């Protein structure tokens, strides 16, 4: 996975020109993990129980997406083989 010419976005993601999906999935995994960690930290700051539940659910969904990208990269699921 070589570096490519790229430009950043507001989220800190690079607009990578590579056609290799692993380059893109790796970047997306990093962003999903960072966002999930951020949301989990925010849960501790919020008193509203419904909002806490929403944020916890958000983190779980982001973690699931991270895992799906990981499974794609490692070809660990039958769908990706």
Segments predicted by a language model, with ranges:
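Generic alpha-helix initiation/capping and coil-helix boundary signal
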Residues: 14, 18, 44, 51-52
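Short, charged, amphipathic alpha-helical segments
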Residues: 49-60
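Secondary-structure edge/capping motif, primarily at the C-terminal ends of alpha-helices
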Residues: 39-50, 73-76, 80
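Amphipathic alpha-helical coiled-coil segments
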Residues: 62-76
């Amino acid at each position: 996975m070589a570096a490519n010419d790229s430009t950043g976005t507001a989220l800190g993601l690079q607009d990578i020109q590579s056609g290799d999906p692993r380059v893109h999935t790796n970047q997306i995994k990093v962003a999903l993990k960072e966002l999930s960690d951020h949301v989990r930290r925010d849960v501790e700051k919020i008193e509203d129980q419904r909002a806490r539940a929403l944020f916890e659910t958000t983190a779980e969904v982001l973690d699931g997406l991270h895992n799906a990208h990981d499974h794609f990269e490692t070809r660990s699921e039958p769908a990706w083989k």
